[in-house]
Amino acid sequence: MHEMQGILLCSGGGTRMPVLTRHVQKCLLPVVGVPMFLYPLSSLLRTGITDIKIFVREVLQLTLEKEVKKSKLLEKYPAHIEYICVNQEDFGTADLLKNHHSKITKDALIVSCDFISDASLIPLVDFFRATNSTLVALIADTCVNAPAPGSKSKKPKATDVMAIVESTGQLAFLCGDDDFDAPLVMEKSLKIFPSIKLTSKYNDCHVYAIRHKVLLNLSKSKHISSFKADFVPLLIDKQFEPDSDIKCFAYRLPHENGFVTAHANTLGSYFEVNKAIQKSFTRLMEYRGNGKNFNYKTDKIAAHESRIEESAEIDKDSVIKRSFISDNCRIGEKTKLKESIIAKGVVIGNGASISNSIICDGVEIGENADVTNCIVAKDQKVPAKGKVQNEVVEDGEDEEWTDD
């Protein structure tokens, strides 16, 4: 596909997940042990796009290059990747696109580094062509999400409000909850489109197909900083001007297109996609292999709907359900792991129980400890028989844990 460029945004800091992004940039956060950005890169490559620009902070460029090479994605999907280094001053996505507009020379498929899906984006691109759209935003009502560990909150609701012309899918309004603080004014759109559905059913996946000519106009706009909060609403409003040729659409991701889709920009969605994407993992990231398999009769280890890396050591009589265990972990005998993410180099003692938790790099959990619905930050220690529940465990908090 030579008429479009892929734009992959990897410069964001991950402010909604500070306990995880304090030690690693969001684009490098591991999802089933693989840096997050490789998933949207795979999506672009599977679409057939051969010209991809990756916007990244300069200090991370070499790391991203190494991870791309290691992934062998370019061996399967040949493409040219250009890394564009951005500065701290490029605060919003629109700022970034404006400041580097000379690098964008075609219609573009813009994808955030936290878009994780096994779905094909080819139907979206086909829709973009067929409708001669100015902008097409990918939306989905099946984005995986869950309450974040470390809290007692209920399952989060969708956070985007949008108005869609039911007959065509044309977008008449789009706003995220962070920006939804003003009265909703839709007089112009209702005059043109009398049948509009206002809904919060869908998530904006932060995947946009957009015409090059409007990106050129963006480069001349001094007062636009955010792509979604500023530029997309501007384009939507311009549809209603006399003689306007601008058309903005929402493309609903069909349920039959893929098994898993996530906009993993929160702790809850990040946590859940680590578990959900495992069913498609070996197809998306072939270079990682199949991981460890166990025969309960001979190994005395029960592992269900889980991925365990080859370098992990699991002792007998352990039970692992819908979890991920990363490289160089040591799991003691008679441990129970359920609905949890175990990062690199974690040591878990005999008889410990971990449920619905994220255990970060280098954590040590003592024998017979019980960790439920928690995030245990990098290099923390939970003592033997320690019990911690609904907590974010960081530096200086170990003295508060109970020893039952």
From Swiss-Prot:
Membrane-crossing residue ranges in chain numbering: none
Keywords of this entry: Cytoplasm, Initiation factor, Protein biosynthesis
Subcellular localization: Cytoplasm, Cytosol
Q: Which InterPro entries match?
A: eIF2B_gamma, NTP_transferase_dom, Nucleotide-diphossugar_trans, Trimer_LpxA-like_sf
Please give the Gene3D superfamilies that the UniProt record associates with this protein: Hexapeptide repeat proteins, Spore Coat Polysaccharide Biosynthesis Protein SpsA, Chain A
Q: Does the keyword Amino-acid biosynthesis apply?
A: no
What Pfam families would the database entry show? Answer: LbH_EIF2B, NTP_transferase
What biological-process terms (Gene Ontology) are attached? cytoplasmic translational initiation
What are the GO MF terms of this UniProt record? guanyl-nucleotide exchange factor activity; translation initiation factor activity
Gene Ontology cellular-component annotations:
cytoplasm; cytosol; eukaryotic translation initiation factor 2B complex; guanyl-nucleotide exchange factor complex
What is the protein's known function? Answer: Acts as a component of the translation initiation factor 2B (eIF2B) complex, which catalyzes the exchange of GDP for GTP on the eukaryotic initiation factor 2 (eIF2) complex gamma subunit. Its guanine nucleotide exchange factor activity is repressed when bound to eIF2 complex phosphorylated on the alpha subunit, thereby limiting the amount of methionyl-initiator methionine tRNA available to the ribosome and consequently global translation is repressed.
Q: Which family does it belong to?
A: Belongs to the eIF-2B gamma/epsilon subunits family.
Among PANTHER family, the record links this protein to: TRANSLATION INITIATION FACTOR EIF-2B SUBUNIT GAMMA
Q: How does it assemble?
A: Component of the translation initiation factor 2B (eIF2B) complex which is a heterodecamer of two sets of five different subunits: alpha, beta, gamma, delta and epsilon. Subunits alpha, beta and delta comprise a regulatory subcomplex and subunits epsilon and gamma comprise a catalytic subcomplex. Within the complex, the hexameric regulatory complex resides at the center, with the two heterodimeric catalytic subcomplexes bound on opposite sides.
From the Swiss-Prot or TrEMBL record, give the protein name: Translation initiation factor eIF2B subunit gamma
Q: Which gene encodes it?
A: eif-2Bgamma
